[in-house]
């Protein structure tokens, strides 16, 4: 008989040795003060220099090597920032912090990443310089944030709402690097699906850009399991002419889904299951049949929570001509499903993050009735959150989905153009949301006088305000520099001109920016400055930087091979 305590005693030394091995981390390298800041600043400079060349209408492209496929050619600031990974760990920390600025700006505003990057570099550089001369970094940061708050108030005063399709086209054109075709196509898309409608960007199959309006619904829930993927072109599941099973309840048992699968199989149609959740035996069976016999099925979690989920499922049922199982007041069981209970759609696209139901076969009169119900709810609700959700539902039911198909002669060209189209689309949405200000980063220059009215508590806070005053000139100077002219002279001339005059870098002339349609979304400018100041001023307060020292791998040597070679040599001769 095996005695457990004796076995455990024998294993104890092994366990201790193993635990030590598992918990041991890399050794750390620690740098203090000026040494650490100098290295971080080098990383900030490297990243900012790479991103800054893309700025403005005459900015250059950046070619990025990829681990697979062709190199990527882009003018998109956040794409360039994300691609940079430095060997030196201290430099890399500086670069990664500014990378975060670009990412945050991109996520919140969808554009303005290059502006955010050059602003962050300027604040960090000026801050480090002042700290090296004995200034207090915490007070400098307070001064910086005081100045940023004043600039944001001034930007809101300058901001004008976007009202006409022409203004929408102008914003999109500027963000697309002056491409009027992209500007017009985005303006058309917004006109057709509404300002809050769903607009997606895809690869086209022709040389020209195309706009397609598809009647359908998109929601932010992807496939439950990646085993449902049925195409090699991207991680997604695509079906044509499919049935849709909708359930308010969780589906766990196989018996619940077999009748619907049999109906879909009998009619030779794929089946899309949208439920609160699909798990247990039901999910295992679906995945197994998908892999073994190629069953055309995909399971997706229903979007939203509580009443919002119920409403969205009901919208889907009306749009597709189906029924919602588990709905209160309806005595429908999944086991008793009939063909008329299943919704019908012309096309389904499901990725890991979202799903699109396109060309629904629902009754037009029922859809119109549902739209009117939502409009009535909009009129009586006072909650901003409720209004937002109702508008989303309204857009999905009434306007459909606009698909921008980007054309080109090669994958490299299409990908570069897609970056610009996505930027332009995001900028346009931001402009519709918060309005527009002067473009070419002239709006930041016009905010400089507002800093004079701030009363700092001490000299170091005053230094922080001066840093922002100097920093606000940097984006306009960078645009001018990329156009081949002296940035400081251009900025000086803009400051001496009337409030609506700025520099048109494409034409190399001073013009009325509003009349020329050179405008920026207020949200983009505001977010770029706020994110840059927050991270860069925090960077200047760093006194110690800790990094890991990678463990050196021992060279196993080639002794065995050498011996083998010798033996083979002897044999051959």
From Swiss-Prot:
Keywords in alphabetical order: Acetylation, ATP-binding, Chaperone, Isomerase, Isopeptide bond, Mitochondrion, Nucleotide-binding, Phosphoprotein, Transit peptide, Ubl conjugation
Binding site for ATP: 75, 111-115, 440, 520
Stretches of the chain forming a coiled coil according to its record: none
GO molecular function, one term: ATP-dependent protein folding chaperone
Major enzyme class: isomerase
Protein's GO biological process: apoptotic mitochondrial changes; mitochondrial unfolded protein response; positive regulation of interferon-alpha production; positive regulation of interleukin-6 production; positive regulation of T cell activation; positive regulation of type II interferon production; protein folding; protein import into mitochondrial intermembrane space
Modified sites of kind Phosphotyrosine: 90
Range annotated as the organelle transit peptide: 1-26
Subcellular location: Mitochondrion matrix
Residue numbers bearing the N6-succinyllysine modification: 31, 82, 125, 133, 191, 202, 205, 218, 236, 250, 301, 352, 396, 481
One Pfam match: Cpn60_TCP1
Gene3D superfamilies documented for this protein: GroEL, GroEL-like equatorial domain, TCP-1-like chaperonin intermediate domain
Covalent cross-link site, Glycyl lysine isopeptide (Lys-Gly) (interchain with G-Cter in SUMO2): 551
Keyword Phosphoprotein: yes
Example of a GO cellular component annotation carried by this entry: mitochondrial matrix
Residue positions where N6-malonyllysine is found in the record: 133
RNA-binding recorded as keyword: no
UniProt xrefs under InterPro entries: Cpn60/GroEL (IPR001844), Cpn60/GroEL/TCP-1 (IPR002423), GroEL-like_apical_dom_sf (IPR027409), GROEL-like_equatorial_sf (IPR027413), TCP-1-like_intermed_sf (IPR027410)
NCBIfam families: GroEL, PRK00013.1, PRK12849.1, PRK12850.1, PRK12851.1
HAMAP family named among the record's database cross-references: CH60
Role summary: Chaperonin implicated in mitochondrial protein import and macromolecular assembly. Together with Hsp10, facilitates the correct folding of imported proteins. May also prevent misfolding and promote the refolding and proper assembly of unfolded polypeptides generated under stress conditions in the mitochondrial matrix. The functional units of these chaperonins consist of heptameric rings of the large subunit Hsp60, which function as a back-to-back double ring.
Family: Belongs to the chaperonin (HSP60) family.
Protein name stated in the entry: 60 kDa heat shock protein, mitochondrial
Source organism: Bos taurus
